[in-house]
Curated annotation (Swiss-Prot):
Activity modulation comment: Under complex allosteric control mediated by deoxynucleoside triphosphates and ATP binding to separate specificity and activation sites on the M1 subunit. The type of nucleotide bound at the specificity site determines substrate preference. It seems probable that ATP makes the enzyme reduce CDP and UDP, dGTP favors ADP reduction and dTTP favors GDP reduction. Stimulated by ATP and inhibited by dATP binding to the activity site.
Catalysed transformations (reactions): a 2'-deoxyribonucleoside 5'-diphosphate + [thioredoxin]-disulfide + H2O = a ribonucleoside 5'-diphosphate + [thioredoxin]-dithiol
Entry-linked Gene3D superfamilies: 3.20.70.20
Modified residue annotations for Phosphothreonine: 778
Keywords: Allosteric enzyme, ATP-binding, Deoxyribonucleotide synthesis, Disulfide bond, Nucleotide-binding, Oxidoreductase, Phosphoprotein
EC number: 1.17.4.1
Residues that bind GDP: 213, 228, 438, 442, 615-618
Family: Belongs to the ribonucleoside diphosphate reductase large chain family.
InterPro entries named among the record's database cross-references: ATP-cone_dom, NrdE_NrdA_C, RNR_lg_C, RNR_lsu_N, RNR_R1-su_N, Rrm1
Biological role: Provides the precursors necessary for DNA synthesis. Catalyzes the biosynthesis of deoxyribonucleotides from the corresponding ribonucleotides.
Protein name: Ribonucleoside-diphosphate reductase large subunit
Site feature: Important for hydrogen atom transfer: 229, 455
Length: 812
């Protein structure tokens, strides 16, 4: 067979990078792949297999670059045989990029600075003159500090994500290597402080942490908009105010920012407008305008689609229409499906639902000030308006709750955030009432018509602190956290702000957001099942360490730069830290009294510090599982240009390989079990416990973990709820459990599992009736059946409210 392949290759030629033609040689391709197999398990990785498939895909005149791309994709497609194939695929792709790009960082930076747009023939620098001069002045040290072999540490999918969106391009051709990008980010943050830049570069390149996507996109460029999150309050309930907010959202989205916008103050449908003697159209037509802005103005010129989350308090008269906006069916003029929706829920609403009480829907024009107060003040004002008969209408609180659950089951929205918890446990409560969160529900900051809240983010890779002895290095975690805190604080000062209101807010309050990724990976490396006591303790102590390290770093900054402007009167200025607001006692890992004494003397430089975000893109780049999430599956599909293939959880694959259990039959069993290994008896129980997916972990335990770490999170957390088959009772129990646990974010997305078997539609031609036959039985399309179904769902919901803990245990 190899002889035949040699005959075939002798008739083919490739075009080299310098334009020369050369015959294709089987042995030469194999040798190139073989050289990249260092430290891989050669019992499973076979370079000849890849070469054979490469030869089959060749044509006469193929370029060496195309040949490398093909070899990389073929290796990636073999990942389900062994995870080392993903490493090999990345090495082939990285090696290819290295051949296409210059080596010296200073040379690459010079090319980026002298970039000429070939369409206009004008010089358009891709990096700033200031940073170009810094690099030029320190070229020798910066060039020698870069370790290019670290590029080979990425897996294939992480590297391809970098290529697609993060590495700077010149006229469509990638100009940077990953190490160049990381040094650009370090120089972009630290400027002339070369020691700090090299320190940051090393931690980034060793993958201890990563800055957020906008920072990776724009550091050291002419417009370094490095912030991820912006929180806006409508400037006014008027045409002028609304369209000023539209413009603000467009400018932020243009600069790659995600948006959280609260619309509590906009008058409800049918309310009179004195200036025109007409009536208001309410929220829906206005939100359709924002929907179109989000579609048109994407984040950073095509890097990511524009993304706006709209926040509303549930007393607003248009709340029922608001809940319909993302649904798949219904009139187009009543839908705005490209926005995301969130409820900013006061405790009073939850109490009324629980007691099956009435709920009054109000217009902010007729009942002003409700969104400006929280807690007892809100309840007094709301009940005063009720007594004065100012409500537009009154409904049963449970009927609105039912509509909320119905929308969540269909669309995964609205997000659920608890207004009073967000304000009661905020270090910014002295500034004013917090009116909304951000796009991803982890940022909780004060915003006002003249202040747009901003947050700069970074996430720490928790798996990096597991030692070879399977202990956790909290000391190193604290050290890295302090560096991350100081980096994020520096970004506040060097950042390009798309709007003056954003600059004003960020310089006054100086909040930052430190998150995490790879928590599930860390647990697997420690051999702790997700629901174990050991995992619970590690979860808490990790966040104790991050909060402690961030506060310590912020206090050190305050010693030299002073506290942030609005520090006086804040809970921290009174010696009250986040865990005090939760009535929680930390473990004895750190000396909190010593820290409180330092803060009492010097203050802190930043009002807020910790905010675990989703980390979708950066976790993929780093090869980690997202945030604090458990794995959603142990096998999943990846799509590349050459087709689809299965990828297995690399930790599981290594464990099964070591147990001599990995083969095609095992792979097929996992695929047929939809990524679960719980029913595969040949796998030892301890291994099965370690690899439970999020669908096999009780929601109650994930909420408890969220509350345990929440006591050390001074912002909030992007907390998803995963329910394989949601019903109204389960969701009601979950929301009430998270509310009573004290969470600020009760739910980011509701994640559900698609039915195992596709639903089959049948049509009765005689009667013209449509029926759905699926896993959950048959639901005929008659009004009677619809009513019966609705009554059953309502009964589930009421049952869960009446039985609470019993429902929580059995249902989740």
């Amino acid at each position: 067979m190899l002889k035949n392949k040699s005959m075939k290759t002798s008739k083919l030629y490739v075009i080299k990078r310098d334009g020369r033609q050369e015959e294709v040689h089987f042995d030469k391709i194999t040798s190139r792949i073989q050289k990249l197999c260092y430290n891989l398990n050669m019992d499973f990785v076979d370079p000849v297999t890849i070469t054979l498939q490469v030869i089959n895909g060749l044509y006469c005149g193929v370029t060496t670059q195309e040949l490398d791309n093909l070899a990389a994709e073929i290796a990636a497609g073999l990942t389900c045989n062994h995870p080392d194939y993903a490493i090999l695929a990345a090495r082939i792709a990285v090696s290819n990029l290295h051949k296409e790009t210059k080596k010296a960082f200073s040379d690459v930076f010079e090319d980026l600075y002298n970039h000429v747009n070939k369409e206009t023939n004008q010089k358009v620098p891709l990096v700033s003159e200031f940073h170009y001069n810094v690099v030029k002045k320190n070229a020798t040290r910066l060039n020698s500090s870069i370790i290019y072999d670290r590029d080979f540490g990425y897996n294939y999918f992480g590297f391809k994500t970098l290529e697609r969106s993060y590495l700077l391009k010149r006229n469509g051709k990638i100009a940077e290597r990953p190490q160049h990008m990381l040094m650009r980010v370090a120089i972009g943050i630290h400027g002339e402080d070369i020691d700090a830049a090299v320190e940051t570069y090393n931690l980034l390149s060793e993958r201890y942490f990563t800055h957020a996507s906008p920072t990776l996109f724009a550091a050291a460029t002419n417009r370094p908009q490095l912030s991820s999150c912006f929180l806006l309050t409508m400037t006014a309930d008027s045409i002028e105010g609304i369209f000023k907010s539209v413009e603000q959202c467009a400018m932020i989205s243009k600069s790659a920012g995600g948006i959280g916008l609260n619309v509590h103050c906009i008058r409800a449908k049918g309310t009179s407008i004195c200036g025109t003697n007409g009536t208001s159209n309410g929220l829906v037509p206005m939100l359709r305008v924002f929907n179109n802005v989000a579609r048109y103005v994407d984040q950073g010129g095509g890097k990511r689609p524009g993304a706006f989350a709209i926040y509303l308090e549930p007393w607003h008269s248009d709340v029922f229409e608001f809940l319909e906006l993302k649904k798949n069916t219904g009139k187009e003029e009543n839908r705005a499906r490209d926005l995301f929706y969130a409820l900013w829920i006061p405790d009073l609403f939850m109490k009324r639902v629980e007691a099956n009480g009435d709920w009054s829907l109000m217009c902010p024009h007729k009942c002003p000030g409700l969104h400006d107060v929280w807690g007892d003040e809100f309840e007094k004002l709301y009940e005063k308006y009720e007594q004065e008969g100012r409500a537009n209408r009154t409904v049963k609180a449970q009927s609105l709750w039912f509509a909320i659950i119905e929308a969540q089951v269909e669309t995964g929205n609205p997000y659920m955030l608890f207004k009073d918890a967000c304000n009661r446990k905020s270090n910014q409560q002295n500034v004013g009432t917090i009116k909304c969160s951000n796009l991803c529900t982890e940022i909780v900051e004060y915003s006002a018509p003249d202040e747009i809240a901003v947050c700069n983010l970074a996430s720490i890779a928790l798996n990096m602190f597991v030692t070879p002895e399977k202990t956790y290095d909290f000391k190193k975690l604290k050290e890295v956290t302090k560096i991350v805190t100081k980096n994020l604080n520096k970004i506040i000062d060097i950042n390009y702000y798309p709007l003056p209101e954003a600059r004003k807010s960020n310089l006054r309050h100086r909040p930052v957001g430190i998150g995490i990724q790879g928590f599930a990976d860390a647990l697997i490396l420690m051999r702790f099942p997700y629901e174990s006591e050991e995992a619970g303790l590690l979860n808490q102590q990790i966040f104790e360490t991050i909060y402690y390290g961030a506060l310590e770093a912020s206090c050190e900054l305050a010693q030299t730069e002073g506290p942030y402007e609005t520090y006086e009167g804040s809970p921290v200025s009174k010696g009250i830290l986040q865990y005090d607001m939760w009535d929680k006692v930390p473990t004895n890992l750190w000396d909190w009294q010593k820290l409180k004494e330092s803060i009492r003397m010097h203050g802190v430089r930043n009002s807020l510090l910790v905010a675990p975000m989703p980390t979708a893109s950066t976790a993929q780049i780093m090869g980690n599982n997202e945030s604090f999430e458990p794995y959603t599956t142990n096998i999943y599909t990846r799509r590349v240009l050459s087709g689809e293939f299965q990828v297995v959880n690399h930790h599981l694959l290594r464990d099964l390989t070591e147990l001599d259990l990995w083969d095609d039959d095992m792979k097929n069993q996992i695929i047929s079990s939809r990524g679960s290994i719980q029913n595969i008896e040949t796998i030892p129980p301890k291994v099965r416990d370690l690899y439970k997916t999020v669908w096999e972990i009780s929601v109650k335990s994930t909420i408890k973990m969220a509350a345990d770490r929440g006591a050390f999170i001074d912002q909030s957390q992007s907390f998803n709820i995963h329910v394989a088959e949601p019903n109204y009772g389960k969701l009601t129990s979950i929301h009430f459990y998270s509310w009573k646990a004290g969470l600020k974010t009760g739910m980011y997305y509701l994640r559900t599992k698609p039915a195992a078997n596709a639903i089959q539609f049948t049509v009765n031609k005689k009667q013209g009736a449509v029926s759905m036959n699926g896993q959950n039985g048959t639901a005929e399309g008659s009004p009677q059946k619809y009513e019966e179904d609705r009554e059953r769902k309502m009964a589930d919901m009421v049952c869960s409210l009446e039985n609470k803990d019993a429902c929580m245990s059995c249902g989740s």
